[in-house]
Amino acid sequence: MARIAGVDLPKDKRAEIALTYIYGIGKPTAQKILAQTGVNPDTRIKDLTEEEVNKLRDYIDKNTKVEGDLRREVALNIKRLIEIGCYRGIRHRRGLPVRGQRTKTNARTRKGPKKTVGARRKK
């Protein structure tokens, strides 16, 4: 099992798909990495030579921000938005959608489960 950027890649998957298990690498980035390193995208991870795995590891370390570094950068970006008090930062702080989606209905993923407000009975 190849280990790249602290992630164990599944050995039965094609290289193109297995690289997407690394946070920060999607399919287009995986294709670009494989093209740059000269590794066949259809090769299974278990069939890669040690030299090819090292090539992939070196390329990813030098040219791509992945895993912990990328997560830290995203968290710092959100923290900066919150600190400067811009609209996007306020939306993050309140746990509401940030990119202009409607909130009168929907937005349940960001808002969480419904909090039902019952009518009060008159005595």
UniProtKB/Swiss-Prot annotation:
Function: Located at the top of the head of the 30S subunit, it contacts several helices of the 16S rRNA. In the 70S ribosome it contacts the 23S rRNA (bridge B1a) and protein L5 of the 50S subunit (bridge B1b), connecting the 2 subunits; these bridges are implicated in subunit movement. Contacts the tRNAs in the A and P-sites.
Species name: Desulforamulus reducens (strain ATCC BAA-1160 / DSM 100696 / MI-1) (Desulfotomaculum reducens)
Keyword Protein transport carried by entry: no
Name this protein carries in UniProt: Small ribosomal subunit protein uS13
Annotated GO CC locations: cytosol; small ribosomal subunit
InterPro entries in alphabetical order: Rbsml_uS13_C, Ribosomal_uS13, Ribosomal_uS13-like_H2TH, Ribosomal_uS13_bac-type, Ribosomal_uS13_CS
Gene name of this polypeptide: rpsM
Biological processes annotated in GO: translation
Keywords associated with the record: Ribonucleoprotein, Ribosomal protein, RNA-binding, rRNA-binding, tRNA-binding
Alphabetized GO MF terms: rRNA binding; structural constituent of ribosome; tRNA binding
Region called Disordered, residue ranges: 96-123
Sequence similarity: Belongs to the universal ribosomal protein uS13 family.
Membrane-traversing stretches: none
Annotated Pfam families: Ribosomal_S13 (PF00416)
Keyword rRNA-binding: yes
